[in-house]
Amino acid sequence: MIRSIFLGTPLAAIPALGVIHRVTDLRLVVTQPDRPRGRSGRPRPSAVKEEALRLSVPVLQPRSRQELVNGVGEARPFDVGVLVAFGRIVPVSALRLANKGFLNLHFSLLPRWRGAAPIQHSILAGEGSTGVTIIEMDAGLDTGPVLASSVQVIAPEDTSGSLEEKLAFRGAQLLVDLLPDYVEGRVRPRAQDDAQATYAPKIEPAEAGLDFREPAGALARRVRAFNPRP
C-alpha cells in the first residue's frame, strides 16, 4: 500500500484527506496551529485537524519551518506527500523527504491563477470555467510540473463557497485516479508555461467592499466571489 502524509488546513481539504486516508497508509497529517476564532477568541482547531483526530491519524501543527521539516522527517519512510490548501510554503528540505515526491492539489487550471485565492479571482474575472490541477511540488509557488487536471464549469449562480465545494470533490477523485500511476512512475510531468501564468493573491477583507459606481455585472461577480468570505 502507498505510504503517505497529508498537509492541509480548511474545510476544502477534507474530501482529499478522506480519500487519502481510504486508499493509502496515511502516516501523518500536518495542519496549521489552532487559531483564535469567534467572539470568544478561544483557539480552535482547523477543520483538517478535527477530521484527522476523528480518523485517529497523528497530527503535527508546526510553528516554524524547522518544526515542519523535523516532523515530516519523523514520519519517514513514506512514498508521497499530498498538500491541499495548507496555507504555508513547504521548504525544499521537507519536499526531499518523500520517496517519490510531494503533490499539490490546486483549485485552478495552472498556470492560470497561481496563488492563495484562485476561486475568488476566477469568479471576479467572469470566467465560464476553471478546474483543478495536481502538480509535483518544487521550490516555487504553484510552479511545479503538471501531472493531471480536470475542468469545472462555473455556473452563473456559483459563489466562491459553492465552487470551492465542487472543486474539492473533483480534486479528491483526481487524486484517487492519479496516485497509483504516479507512485509507479507511469505519469509524465508536463512543465508549466510561465508566460501564460496569472496570479491570485490573497484578498483581504478591506478589499471586498462594493463600489456602486461599478457596472451591475461587476458588482454581482464581487458578491459571488466574496461569499461566504473574501
Provide a role label for each language-model segment:
Residues 1-228:
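One-carbon transfer enzymes
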